[in-house]
Amino acid sequence: MTSVTLGHLDETLHEATAAAVARVLEAYELEIEYVPATHEALMAHMRNGDIDLFVSAWLPDVDVAYLDPALGMEPLGDLYRPEFGWYLPTAAATGLTSIAELAADGHDVNREIVAAQSVLDRVRQGVAAYNLTEHGFTIAARPDAEAMQYADQAIKAGEPAVIALWQPNFLHYGSTSLTPLLDPKGALGTAQTARMLVRRAVRADLDSDMLDELDELTLGNKVVSALDHAMRVEDMSADAAAEAWQRGKLLPR
């Protein structure tokens, strides 16, 4: 093969991660055609055999639909470990360390939880598991972009607001601005593994050394958060962010 189609969700985090993976493909002199799309469109592309490599499926739960045998894709590698959690801005200095403590009196945490539409079900699970509605908590559903803007402003202002967020994410860049809240009941779900998917029909045609290299490629949550930050905040292209990572200039020292 001299070229591959590389699919990814049409979001900065996934676009930047795909660009990082593409560095390996380019080293084997492959031409790359990117296929950014929605979940539904990507599944249709897979079903039609239009995607050779996909970056990336969050398994075993979030993106399990991609493993439908009819799509013809197989997991490869372990790029990073997505995990959903609740956080408080570190600058708010609330002293709270657990979601369970939100049900107690005497704290000034905002009782309106602004939740992105994409994580609304998980936020509802957390509120229900810890009986937070009985303690005055409500959920305000917002479009993802609006919820991210709210979270960004709350972090910068040091407001005592619950931030419901996956990591990696650009808001985790630097890893010091958010304090995680423990989830002793496991209400928010388990950590995932971000894995590439390779089209079964072309796997035998791909260089075995390249597949081994992809299988061993690990970016980690810090790097992916930094890639996302580079695109969202520093206005870098995905290729520029991936190049900065490759040259060791992406993470703060």
Regions from the language model: what does each represent?
Residues 12, 134, 144-156, 164, ...:
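An extracytoplasmic/periplasmic, membrane-proximal ligand-sensing/linker region
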Residues 20-28, 106-140, 244-247:
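Ligand-binding cleft/hinge of the Venus flytrap
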